[in-house]
Design a protein with these regions (language model features):
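Short acidic/polar active-site loop segments enriched in Thr and Asp
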Residues: 31, 98, 129
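Short beta-strand-to-loop acidic/aromatic patch adjacent to the donor-nucleotide binding site
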Residues: 97-108
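Catalytic-site signature of metal-activated, phosphate-bearing donor transferases
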Residues: 77-82, 111-272
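Active-site-proximal specificity loops/subdomain of glycosyltransferases
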Residues: 52-99
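N-proximal low-complexity "stem/linker" segments adjacent to membrane-targeting elements
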Residues: 1-23
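A conserved acidic beta->alpha catalytic loop
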Residues: 37-53, 66-69
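A structural signal for isolated positions on well-ordered beta-strands in alpha/beta enzyme cores
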Residues: 6-8, 32-34, 59-61
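Short, acidic, metal-binding catalytic loop of nucleotide-sugar glycosyltransferases
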Residues: 23-32
């Protein structure tokens, strides 16, 4: 099997982060990037068109998904999972991609050695249907410059139980979700190649690793991970709150799934 990996996301008013997100993942071997924009008021469209024009070597697709969003909300359906399902179905039926990964624009798939490509990583576990990578959450830093690159020479990160999952394109796919997916007779592993531990009840269908596993491995770096830039800088953190969660049919002005510009007390202690 030829390994060919696609990356996909939904995004709202994230033009400031689109270039670094695209180039980061293109550098690690993702061969196509697709973004569905919703409720966008910034220059994301123009920016994506500019990147397409100046970087034809990167396959970039984007779509204005407002109509699809409204349809989901009117039917009380999850827009994010619906978008993922549409992208998955289309990619499976019309392309030769073998795998797909769904991330947000504040998430960066990263190999620890900063060299291994996503295809090379997958090739070490060719029989796996799904490979899950734990979040490493950035820590608050009031001295950090606004719009700093996602990585520097010194990175203090907290390992979180949540995962993001690269998955095979297969007709055995039963349900797509945000953190992991349900595949009939699927083989689910972690970044270290071991079987995904715990019961589906404890791990919420493999969306997060078990508590006992985290206690043992919370301070151990993985061969690959997903950097989750929840915090960035104070200004950026406050700005992110204003994007709300309209795609979840949550009409509140602010994001309600954030705890403040503080260390995450649900994650392991920060490590360099």
């Amino acid at each position: 099997m030829t390994i060919k990996v696609k990356l996909a996301a939904i995004a709202k008013d994230e033009a400031a982060y689109i270039p670094q997100w695209i180039h980061h993942h293109a550098a690690f071997g993702f061969q196509e990037i697709e973004i569905w924009l919703n409720n966008t008021t910034d220059n994301s469209i123009e920016l994506l068109q500019d990147i397409q024009s100046k970087h034809p070597e990167i396959s970039i697709k984007f779509k204005m998904a407002d109509e699809f969003l409204e349809r989901c909300l009117s039917q009380n359906l999850q827009f994010q999972q619906g978008a993922y399902s549409e992208i998955y179905k289309s990619t499976f039926e019309t392309s030769d991609f073998s795998h797909i990964l769904f991330l947000d624009l504040d998430e960066f798939w990263t190999p620890q050695d900063f060299t291994t490509t996503i295809a090379d990583f997958i090739s070490s576990s060719p029989d796996a249907d799904a490979i899950s990578f734990q979040w490493l959450i950035d820590t608050p830093d009031t001295y950090k410059h606004i719009f700093s690159p996602p990585f520097s020479h010194l990175n203090k990160l907290q390992k979180n139980r949540h995962v993001k999952t690269v998955v095979k394109l297969t007709n055995r796919m039963t349900e797509l979700s945000v953190h992991n997916h349900i595949i009939k007779d699927g083989e689910f592993i972690l970044a270290d190649g071991t079987q995904f531990p715990g019961t589906d009840q404890e791990t919420l269908n493999k969306s997060l690793v078990p508590i006992a596993f985290q206690k043992i491995n919370g301070m151990r770096p993985d061969k690959a991970f997903v950097l989750h830039q929840i915090n960035r800088t104070p200004v950026e953190y406050l700005s992110s709150l204003l994007r709300g969660r309209g795609h979840k049919n949550d009409q509140r002005v602010f994001k309600a799934n954030r705890i403040g510009y503080i260390l995450d007390n649900q994650s392991a202690p920060a490590m360099d």
